[in-house]
């Protein structure tokens, strides 16, 4: 079994509480948890320079990502690490479209910015606040890989429900 965490914050944004990034904290977290892969998913922004520094320092696969406020819920969008300049430019459009913690974009806005959602891993907050609304999930469902839950109990419940998204549970850590 692979150990991954696709929900790691390294930059405090308007949607976050204040914290200061520490490469040592990130290195220790990766080592202590025995992680084989991570994604950097800050709220509504992607810092290409910092991402490149993390890739140099962390001896595992690091994917670029972003946690986007979409229709009042959160969606992890993770890229493959190719075309980083293009990914960064798209994330800058997200950053400009969501200037405050109370703002969000529509699914149509998301599709207009990222164009081909099949190129990304999409993981909405599923049984986790702010939870994706059913109408939003219906629009994204064809491209959703899994749903993020908050606990082992919710994970187990989703595993037993044939209609539920495949559950994943990440750290949602601030480094």
Predicted regions and their residues:
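Broad hydrophobic/π-residue packing in well-ordered secondary structure
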Residues: 1, 78-81, 174
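An N-terminally biased module of ancient metal coordination in phosphate/nucleic-acid-related enzymes
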Residues: 1-72
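Active-site neighborhood of phospho(di)ester-bond hydrolases with catalytic His/Asp-centered motifs
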Residues: 4-6, 37-43, 63-66, 122-125, ...
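Active-site environment of divalent metal-dependent phosphoester hydrolases
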Residues: 11-13, 40-49, 69-71, 128-133, ...
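A structural signal for short coil/turn segments at secondary-structure junctions
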Residues: 33, 117-118, 162-163
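Extended substrate/RNA-proximal surfaces in nucleic-acid metabolism proteins
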Residues: 47-148
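Active-site-adjacent C-terminal substructures of enzyme catalytic domains
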Residues: 133-171
């Amino acid at each position: 079994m692979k150990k991954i965490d696709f929900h790691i914050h390294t930059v405090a944004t308007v949607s976050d509480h204040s914290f200061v990034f520490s490469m040592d904290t990130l290195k220790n977290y990766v080592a202590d948890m025995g992680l084989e892969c991570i994604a950097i998913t800050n709220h509504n922004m992607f810092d290409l320079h910092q991402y490149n520094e993390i890739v140099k320092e962390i001896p595992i696969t690091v994917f670029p990502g972003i946690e986007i406020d979409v229709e009042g819920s959160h969606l992890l969008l993770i890229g493959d690490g190719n075309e980083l300049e293009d990914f960064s430019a798209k994330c800058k459009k997200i950053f400009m479209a969501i200037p405050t913690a109370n703002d969000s974009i529509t699914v149509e806005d998301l599709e207009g910015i990222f164009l081909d959602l099949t190129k990304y891993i999409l993981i909405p907050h599923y049984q986790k606040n702010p939870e994706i609304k059913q109408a939003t999930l219906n629009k994204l469902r064809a491209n959703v890989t899994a749903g993020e839950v908050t606990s082992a109990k919710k994970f187990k419940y989703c595993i037993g429900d044939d209609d539920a998204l495949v559950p994943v549970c990440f750290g949602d850590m601030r480094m």
